[in-house]
Design a protein with these regions (language model features):
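Gram-negative (and chloroplast) outer-membrane scaffold detector with strong preference
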Residues: 57-131, 190-193
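Predominantly the C-terminal beta-signal and adjacent terminal strand-loop region
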Residues: 75-78, 147-193
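Extracellular loop and loop/strand-boundary signature of outer-membrane beta-barrel proteins
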Residues: 41-44, 79-86, 133-139, 171-175
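Bacterial N-terminal signal peptides that target proteins for export
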Residues: 1-7
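Short glycine/proline- and aromatic-enriched beta-strand/turn motifs that initiate or cap beta-hairpins
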Residues: 20-70, 189-193
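Residues that define the transmembrane beta-barrel architecture of outer-membrane proteins
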Residues: 28-30, 48-54, 87-93, 109, ...
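Membrane-spanning beta-strand positions in outer-membrane beta-barrel proteins
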Residues: 31, 67, 110-112, 156, ...
Length: 193
């Protein structure tokens, strides 16, 4: 009896102490991610200059656990004007490179720093330049370009699903409205291969 108990305990110890961990951040891995968050501060009600953004991206992992990212993003912000709010929308495409600089031993958490190029289109008040009070908007709809610096945390929930938290600063130099936008967002990444 003691012999079977000893073998059983030894078997359980072998199973728990030498666990194999999932392979993550391997060259050639691909992922799809969706993110949503707030821009230019945290405003919970729509009576202030409320701003939000949503985005989707495709990632391809390279050597040294870095990755290329391409994607698109929509940013919506309202600016106060007298007793109304004027909406501004930006539609941008992104292409960038993210460098992993920190991870834990179990490969569950990854911290990356990314640099991206952005290009897109900006529209004010849905292209309506005449306001209800008779004023005319001088801001024109225009093509925008610039870049973004991103700090991103990936926390793997399963082998194929990761929770994302990121903070980024967008600089769009050709924008008529605002050159810089700070964004904070949460999202999910799905590994597809």
């Amino acid at each position: 009896m003691k012999r079977f108990l000893f073998i059983g305990i030894l078997f359980v110890l072998c199973l728990t102490s030498f666990q194999a961990h999932a392979q993550r951040y391997l060259p050639g891995m691909k992922g799809l991610q969706v993110t949503a968050g707030m821009a230019d501060g945290v405003h919970w009600n729509s009576d202030t200059d409320f701003a939000y953004h949503i985005g989707a991206a495709y990632s391809v992992y390279t050597k040294n656990a870095n990755r290329w990212v391409i994607g698109g993003e929509y940013l919506h912000k309202k600016y106060d004007y007298k007793d109304m709010q004027i909406p501004v929308e930006q539609f941008t495409a992104e292409g960038g490179y993210y460098l992993k600089f920190l991870s834990d031993r179990r490969k569950t958490f990854f911290l990356s720093l990314g640099l991206s190029a952005l290009a897109g289109y900006e529209t004010s008040n849905q292209s309506e330049k005449l306001l209800p009070d008779g004023s005319t908007l001088l801001d024109k709809d225009c093509f925008i370009y610039g870049g973004a610096l991103t700090l991103e945390l990936e926390a793997y929930l399963t082998d194929r699903i990761a929770l994302l938290a990121n903070a980024r600063e967008r600089a769009l130099f050709s924008s008529d409205i605002g050159k810089f936008h700070t964004q904070v967002s949460l999202g999910l990444k799905f590994i597809i291969n």
